[in-house]
Amino acid sequence: MSYLIVGASSGLGRELAYVFAGKGNSIIISSRDAKDLDAIKSDITNKFKNVSVQTLPADLNSPEDFINNLKIKGKGFSDIEGAIFPVGGMFDEDGIYLENDKVEKILKINFSSITLIISELSKAFNDNGKGLVIGFGSVSGLLGRKFNSHYAASKRALESYFESLAASQSNDKIKIQFYILGYLETNLSFGKNLKLPKGSPKKLAELVYKKKNINFKKIYFPFWWGLIAFLLKIIPINFLIKLIKNSKS
């Protein structure tokens, strides 16, 4: 049985690949870049002997192709024990008036393609009587914003979807988990002047592995974002909208 890790070529996805393989688990690692995947596979198999690593070069902009290729790798999904989606994509110019084709790409990568893949996998998990699905949102989705508007909206939609996914499970052996992420030490945040400290992808990957068998829970990382989320919920929305209008981000 294998764990599917989508977006495994860098950042959190890469760290998850190393953590899960380091614990002796077989993994299927996926991203758009076949060369990056091959390099990671070679390094992991050198570090951790007798661990199976398969690569799945695929693009979430083509979810049907992704699913068909995954069926081949995962023997019709019957060989997949869990699916982890540390993926996300955005455009620097993302705002309400972003071009339609870019909006479509943002929604696919951050939301709709993920739900299509999970829908297919869920059938296999129900047949097997067990499974694991882990999704990752963003603190960007806590509140509407002038910039990264569609990215934030898609991450909020994904959070709602995972709540529905958890509510739909009648088998407690199918675990659904969702992490809401603040800033991490990745290439996406490199060089940015951020007001809050960045979290470690490696520490997060270790936390994900440690908590993979718990029942549904939304986990904020770094943890202090949970307090910020609580405060945003109790502040009147009209006041928050005024702040957003007057802000530069």
Model segments located where?
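Conserved glycine-rich Rossmann-like NAD(P)H-binding loop of the short-chain dehydrogenase/reductase
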Residues: 23-40
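Conserved glycine-rich cofactor-binding loop
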Residues: 9-10
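Rossmann-fold cofactor-recognition segment
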Residues: 47-64
